[in-house]
């Protein structure tokens, strides 16, 4: 059984999100919905407290009681089950991919996308500090002179979905998670470097699934104004911020 969950992490208070489904084909694709006639179909909701702890309520024909794991707590009719997972505090735009469940052995393997060169990170409270890593570079195509590639295949409400639309669809629609965008762009012929420019895509691999934003402006002091979706304010919420010149040079920019 293959399951992909797209979640937004709250840094304060509680966040509640509901999902239902059985299968998905790729990261950041929607699932097919809960089916009561499917022996492996299920749905669940979960809350995330201020410490980043996950609290799950399961409904349907499968739940984590079928697994032998520990650490994060799931609730099904007020029975507690354990799941061996890491704590994901202060990350945004995460698609948690739980793959390769086998009912016979009752085991599970978590496959995480990594991909992409770019800014590495460390965290202090809710602040992300990046350090420079060389960006891949390739020339031949550009966002400004490109053409629309087709439908937006990224998950609605995520940063990748917003940026694809913001650039008019003039990039690939199957670049995967944000962490992979720099490499995918370079492979497709776009220029990727550490120099911000209006209309470029800012990309980083910080967190497990990275983040992308659209460059709205570059100020005279080198600071960069970006707009973005699902960065600290929930899926589907577009916000803007200004990044210092020092930090800006640590991100990848796709042109």
From Swiss-Prot:
Residues 134-255 form the Peptidase C51 domain. Pfam families: CHAP. GO terms for cellular component: extracellular region. The keyword Transferase does not apply. Sequence repeats lie at residues 75-78, 88-91, 98-101. Induction: Activated by two-component regulatory system YycG/YycF. It is found in: Secreted. Its main location: secreted. Residues 1-26 form the signal peptide. PROSITE patterns: CHAP (PS50911). InterPro entries: CHAP_dom, Papain-like_cys_pep_sf. Residues 75-101 are annotated as: 3 X 4 AA repeats of Y-N-N-Y. Gene3D superfamilies: endopeptidase domain like (from Nostoc punctiforme) (3.90.1720.10). Keywords: Repeat, Secreted, Signal, Virulence. SUPFAM superfamilies: Cysteine proteinases. Not known; immunogenic protein. This is Staphylococcal secretory antigen SsaA. The gene is ssaA.
């Amino acid at each position: 059984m293959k399951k992909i969950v797209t979640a937004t992490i709250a840094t304060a208070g509680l966040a509640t999100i509901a999902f239902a489904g059985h299968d998905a084909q790729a990261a950041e694709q929607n699932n097919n919905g809960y089916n009561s006639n499917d022996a492996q179909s299920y749905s669940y909701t979960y809350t995330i407290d201020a410490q980043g702890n996950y609290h799950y309520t399961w409904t349907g024909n499968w739940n984590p009681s079928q697994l032998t794991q520990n650490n994060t707590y799931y609730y099904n009719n007020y029975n507690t089950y354990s799941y061996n997972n890491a704590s994901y505090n202060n990350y945004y735009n995460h698609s948690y991919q739980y793959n390769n469940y086998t009912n016979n052995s009752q085991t599970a393997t978590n496959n995480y996308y990594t991909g992409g060169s770019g800014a590495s990170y460390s965290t202090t409270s809710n602040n992300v500090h990046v350090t420079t890593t060389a960006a891949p570079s390739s020339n031949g195509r550009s966002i400004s002179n490109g053409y629309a590639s087709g439908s937006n295949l990224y998950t609605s409400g995520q940063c990748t979905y917003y940026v694809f639309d913001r650039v008019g669809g003039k990039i690939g629609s199957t670049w995967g998670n944000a962490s992979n965008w720099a490499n995918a762009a370079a492979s497709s012929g776009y220029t990727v470097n550490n120099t911000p420019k209006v209309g470029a895509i800012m990309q980083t691999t910080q967190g497990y699934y990275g983040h992308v934003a659209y460059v709205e402006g570059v100020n005279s002091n080198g600071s960069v104004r970006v707009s973005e979706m699902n960065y600290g304010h929930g899926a589907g919420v577009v916000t803007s911020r200004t990044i210092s010149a020092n930090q800006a040079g640590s991100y990848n920019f796709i042109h």
